Amino acid sequence: MAQSLNKVVDLQTTGTSYLSIQGKVGKFLVGDQALEFYADRNVEDYIQIPWSSIHQIGANVSGRKVSRHFEVFTDQGKFLFASKDSGKILKIARKKLGNDKVVKLPTLLQIIGRKIKNLFAKK
């Protein structure tokens, strides 16, 4: 039986985890201790990320609209999630982590431009 790290849940919403090749649909529990994801098919297939182990959390922003996909950077690696309520999740994360750890991710054009610039940079 999966035990939640959270004592108080601030937000419960549906979403998708892209940890494997196929996305897993499930529920997010955002609370006082951790960001948690529980798959719908198998509750024992879960991801618990304590707030203390998160280095950064970010999403793409276009104008004033936050995309549904967001990434969580931790000690263990990078986790990719999607939720219709990603803006609410990021607001709660900003309260728990601070403004410096919630970032705006670069767009595809910015990544390509950086790669091209590095190709022609003097070494």
PLM regions with names:
Residues 17-71, 75:
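Phosphoinositide-binding peripheral membrane targeting modules
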